[in-house]
A protein has these predicted regions:
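Short acidic alpha-helix initiation/capping motifs at coil-to-helix transition points
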Residues: 1-5, 46-47
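Basic, Lys/Arg-enriched C-terminal extension of HTH/homeodomain DNA-binding domains
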Residues: 5-11, 53-80
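The N-cap/first-turn positions of alpha helices
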Residues: 20-24
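A cross-family signal for key residues in well-ordered alpha-helices
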Residues: 26, 39, 69
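Short helix-to-turn junction characteristic of helix-turn-helix DNA-binding domains
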Residues: 28-32, 71
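Recognition helix of helix-turn-helix DNA-binding domains
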Residues: 31-66
C-alpha cells in the first residue's frame, strides 16, 4: 500500500509516531518483513520488533495486517 506524504503526516499526528516509526510503518505497508526492514534501515531485527511494538501500542492494534487496516480506516474517515 502506497500512501501520499500528507497521508503519512496525518497518521503521524494521529498517534504521535516518531520519524523512525513512520519509516518502519511505510516499509510494513510495502510488504517488507522484519528482516528486510532491518536491512533497509540498517538496524537490528530486534530494533525493528521494538519499533513495531511501539507502533502497535500507539495505534491500538496487534499485527501488521491490523495496522494497515487501521491506517486505511482512519484515512477513509478523514477523507484524506
Amino acid at each position: 500500500m502506497v500512501l501520499k506524504s500528507k497521508q503519512w503526516d496525518y497518521l503521524s499526528k494521529c498517534w504521535h509516531l516518531t520519524p523512525r516509526e513512520i519509516q518502519v510503518a511505510k516499509l510494513v505497508c510495502k510488504g517488507l518483513d522484519n528482516e528486510q526492514i532491518g536491512q533497509k534501515l540498517q538496524i537490528e531485527y530486534n530494533t525493528v520488533r521494538a519499533h513495531l511494538g511501539n507502533i502497535f501500542h500507539k495505534v491500538g492494534v496487534r499485527g501488521k495486517a491490523n495496522l494497515i487496516l487501521e491506517f486505511v480506516a482512519v484515512l477513509q474517515r478523514a477523507k484524506i
